[in-house]
Swiss-Prot record:
Database matches in InterPro entries: UreE, UreE_C_dom, UreE_N, UreE_N_sf
Statement: the UniProt record of this protein carries the keyword Chaperone: yes
HAMAP family for the chain: UreE
Region (Disordered): 138-161
Gene Ontology biological process terms, A to Z: protein folding; protein-containing complex assembly; urea metabolic process
Family (UniProt): Belongs to the UreE family.
Pfam families: UreE_C, UreE_N
Full protein name: Urease accessory protein UreE
Keywords on record: Chaperone, Cytoplasm, Nickel, Nickel insertion
Keyword check for Chaperone: yes
Any one GO MF annotation of this record: unfolded protein binding
Cell compartment(s), UniProt: Cytoplasm
Function recorded in the entry: Involved in urease metallocenter assembly. Binds nickel. Probably functions as a nickel donor during metallocenter assembly.
Length: 161
């Protein structure tokens, strides 16, 4: 079985991926795992440390192939506000509850939770069910664990401690 022992962050120039693996947001924090690719092949991810993968990251297979990490469609709430200040206030309430949130310029995406929906609607938000890829913002404790510090030779070391 082929192994993956390194990766490149999304947007790294180079060869096109030969395949992909689709994972939900809570399945993308990995160190060692057997991954089932879209073509029914399997590869063993075997990294030195756990990595929080983002949509578009590339896994480097020992034979030189690249496998793209894709964010799976998930059942989410799309939250819209009356204006920007209102959106900021809604984001504050979600952050105060330590909820994973994808914060965009005009909306916020969160995993569905009927209690949170009621709270948001009570605060004047428009909440709609959607199914799409979920890429929540990384928390403050992941600030130094992003994909921006290359240590050369195509290997990337990430400290998520």
């Amino acid at each position: 079985m082929l192994r993956v022992t390194s990766y490149h962050p999304a947007g790294t120039p180079g060869d096109e991926p030969s395949g992909y693996v689709t994972l939900a947001h809570d399945q993308r924090h990995l160190r060692r795992k057997l991954l089932h690719l879209q073509n029914d092949e399997m590869v063993m991810l075997d990294l030195k440390e756990a990595v929080l993968f983002a949509h578009g990251d590339l896994l480097v297979v020992e034979n030189g192939d690249l496998i793209e990490v894709r964010a799976a469609d998930e059942k989410l709430f799309e939250i819209k506000a009356k204006d920007r200040l209102h959106l900021i206030e809604l984001a504050w309430h979600l952050g105060n509850r330590h909820l994973a949130a994808q914060i965009e310029e005009e909306r916020i995406l969160i995993l569905r939770d009927h209690v949170i929906r009621a709270m948001l609607e009570g605060l004047g938000a428009t909440v709609r069910d959607v199914e799409e890829p979920f890429q929540p913002a990384r928390g403050a404790y992941h600030a130094h664990g992003g994909h921006s510090h290359d240590h050369g030779q195509g290997h990337h070391h990430h400290d998520h401690g």
